[in-house]
Amino acid sequence: KRLLQNLGIEINQVIPEGGFVEDLQNLPKAWFNFVPYREIGLMTAVYLEKEFGMPYVSITPMGIVDTAECIRQIQKHINELAVVSLEETVDYEPYIYQQTKFV
């Protein structure tokens, strides 16, 4: 959650954390799905991509390389949708640089 919040991304749902069955109807409102642990939720993300065209990111943000790649995948999906919906694109490279420059 903290990574997404640091990037300024509003979280639609965290499933199954505190969720109700009624909340599932809001899943298609998300721009993409984030599956930080492939063992949990990947099949659901694949289904949502197939049924609703919702892309997903399934890279676990652990370690410098994977965290940077995860953020770049998030950026890619947001920017693809931003072009279609005439929203602003995002550039998370400064964030990645800031988080890794002293490592």
UniProtKB/Swiss-Prot annotation:
Localisation: Plastid, Chloroplast
Coiled coil: none
Cofactor list: [4Fe-4S] cluster
Keyword 4Fe-4S included in the entry's annotation: yes
Catalytic activity line of the entry: chlorophyllide a + oxidized 2[4Fe-4S]-[ferredoxin] + 2 ADP + 2 phosphate = protochlorophyllide a + reduced 2[4Fe-4S]-[ferredoxin] + 2 ATP + 2 H2O
Gene Ontology cellular-component annotations: chloroplast
Family membership noted in the UniProt record: Belongs to the ChlB/BchB/BchZ family.
Family annotation (PANTHER family): LIGHT-INDEPENDENT PROTOCHLOROPHYLLIDE REDUCTASE SUBUNIT B (PTHR33712:SF7)
Identification of the protein by name: Light-independent protochlorophyllide reductase subunit B
Originating organism: Diphasiastrum complanatum
